[in-house]
Amino acid sequence: MIQGKTKTGFVYQLDDNTMNNMELVDAMAELDDGGHPFALSRVCLLLLGKDQRKRLYDHIRTEDGKVPPQAMGEEIADIIRGFGEQGKNSVPSPE
């Protein structure tokens, strides 16, 4: 289990094999290519699951009740960077 916190203070947990999901990779590639903007919602769901996605929405929700896509993109990028950093620092388990 990988645990982390974004720059804005959102605390999350990801399974070690979260990135080992071709559907997530496809959705991330679609975002990266400037493709369909709805891919961000799919990336968030595949990365965090329903409960954590709801918590993240509430975390970045504005006073008028909206969840800004720009803020969501920044949070997701921060989570993915954190996942990569923890992955580099993890110790492989003995076989």
Spans of features found by a protein language model:
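Short acidic, Pro/Gly- and aromatic-enriched capping/linker segments at domain boundaries
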Residues: 1-5
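Short, surface-exposed, charged amphipathic helix/loop patches that serve as local interaction elements
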Residues: 7-10, 15-95
